[in-house]
């Protein structure tokens, strides 16, 4: 294979992986909502004075 052919194949691979990765970004919207819900639960439990999450557990008791 010549250099020009190898460069063309490289460009095709880069372009196809870029195009394929865009639709998967929109599929993560639902997962982002779940992550936001978990974070709000952590902050809510902090306001109640108890937290079982490792990030806030050292400051508050777990309450179990």
From Swiss-Prot:
Entry keyword Signal: yes
Molecular-function GO terms, alphabetical:
acetylcholine receptor inhibitor activity; ion channel regulator activity; toxin activity
Q: Which PROSITE patterns match?
A: ALPHA_CONOTOXIN
Q: Which residues carry this modification: Cysteine amide?
A: 62
Q: Which domain of life is it from?
A: Eukaryota
What are the disulphide bonds in this sequence?
51-56, 52-62
- The name this protein goes by in its record: Alpha-conotoxin CnIA
Keywords (alphabetical) are: Acetylcholine receptor inhibiting toxin, Amidation, Disulfide bond, Hydroxylation, Ion channel impairing toxin, Neurotoxin, Postsynaptic neurotoxin, Secreted, Signal, Toxin
What is the additional note? Found in injectable (milked) (IV) venom.
Among the Pfam families in the record, one is Toxin_8
Q: Which GO cellular component terms, listed alphabetically, does the Swiss-Prot or TrEMBL entry include?
A: extracellular region; host cell postsynaptic membrane
The parts of the chain that form a coiled coil are none
As for subcellular location, the record says:
Secreted
- Modification sites for 4-hydroxyproline: 54
Summarizing the function annotation, the protein's role is: Alpha-conotoxins act on postsynaptic membranes, they bind to the nicotinic acetylcholine receptors (nAChR) and thus inhibit them. CnIA and CnIB block muscular nAChR alpha-1/gamma and alpha-1/delta subunits.
Record family assignment: Belongs to the conotoxin A superfamily.
The answer to whether the entry has keyword Glycoprotein is no
* N-terminal signal peptide: 1-21
The domain-related comment in the record is: The cysteine framework is I (CC-C-C). Alpha3/5 pattern.
Organism for this UniProt entry: Conus consors
Propeptide positions: the record gives 22-47
Which tissues does the record link to its expression?
Answer: Expressed by the venom duct.
Q: What is its main location?
A: secreted
């Amino acid at each position: 294979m010549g250099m020009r052919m190898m460069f063309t194949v490289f460009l095709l691979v880069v372009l196809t992986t870029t195009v394929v990765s865009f639709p998967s970004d929109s599929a993560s919207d639902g997962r982002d909502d779940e992550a936001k819900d978990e974070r709000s639960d952590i902050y809510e439990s902090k306001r109640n004075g108890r937290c079982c999450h490792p990030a806030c557990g050292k400051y508050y008791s777990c309450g179990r």
